[in-house]
């Protein structure tokens, strides 16, 4: 058995799980998420837990077993607690402005400001001119939006200027030697 896949997914009170064939829908206080489970894997509802089962020990089944369990667990955590990814902006004149909960305006050293709109289910929390948070219930979507914001101006290795994840260490390079 997959070490991760065989662990049951705890379903806290206030979270409703519906299994319709291969479709698992999780409804909680923060919203609703659903996922279609890959072919050989099945999800069974128990007493306050969800069990992810696989029919055989094929290589693909083993891989999908742990993956499916993690995706279902991420949905349960998302609808109860939600996810947040924090970003920092480093550089002279680099800053972010909030234009509402789903729109940001960045000044990142280009000749024009960059407007960034959040997809549905994502909100932004601007904690200062150089700090922001991306929040939502879908872990994959939160990470993707944070990566897209970071891509607007990746941290460069000489001065470290750009958008980075909070706590991210940028590998620095030594500049060219002067005369």
From Swiss-Prot:
Molecular function terms, GO-annotated: rRNA binding; structural constituent of ribosome
Acyltransferase as UniProt keyword: no
GO process terms (BP): cytoplasmic translation
UniProt cross-references to Pfam families, sorted A to Z: Ribosomal_L6 (PF00347)
GO CC, alphabetical: cytosolic large ribosomal subunit
Keyword annotations: Ribonucleoprotein, Ribosomal protein, RNA-binding, rRNA-binding
PROSITE patterns: RIBOSOMAL_L6_1
Top-level division of the source organism's lineage: Bacteria
Family assignment from sequence similarity: Belongs to the universal ribosomal protein uL6 family.
HAMAP family given in the database record: Ribosomal_uL6_B
Role of this protein: This protein binds to the 23S rRNA, and is important in its secondary structure. It is located near the subunit interface in the base of the L7/L12 stalk, and near the tRNA binding site of the peptidyltransferase center.
Complexes and interactors: Part of the 50S ribosomal subunit.
Annotated protein name in UniProt: Large ribosomal subunit protein uL6
Organism: Nocardioides sp. (strain ATCC BAA-499 / JS614)
Gene: rplF
């Amino acid at each position: 058995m997959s070490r991760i896949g065989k662990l049951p997914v705890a379903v806290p009170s206030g979270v409703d799980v519906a299994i319709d064939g291969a479709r698992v829908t999780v409804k909680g206080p923060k919203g609703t998420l659903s996922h279609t489970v890959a072919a050989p894997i099945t999800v069974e509802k128990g007493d306050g837990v969800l069990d992810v089962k696989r029919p055989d020990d094929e290589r693909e089944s083993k891989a999908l077993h742990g993956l499916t369990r993690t995706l279902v667990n991420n949905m349960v955590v998302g609808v109860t607690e939600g996810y947040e990814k924090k970003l920092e902006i480093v550089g002279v004149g680099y800053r972010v402005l909030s234009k509402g909960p789903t729109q940001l305006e960045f000044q990142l050293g280009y000749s024009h400001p960059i407007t960034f709109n959040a997809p549905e289910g994502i909100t932004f929390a601007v904690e200062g001119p150089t700090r922001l948070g991306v929040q939502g219930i879908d872990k994959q979507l939160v990470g993707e939006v944070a990566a897209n914001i970071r891509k607007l101006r990746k941290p460069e290795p000489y001065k470290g200027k750009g958008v980075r994840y909070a706590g991210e260490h940028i590998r620095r390079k030594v500049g060219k030697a002067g005369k």
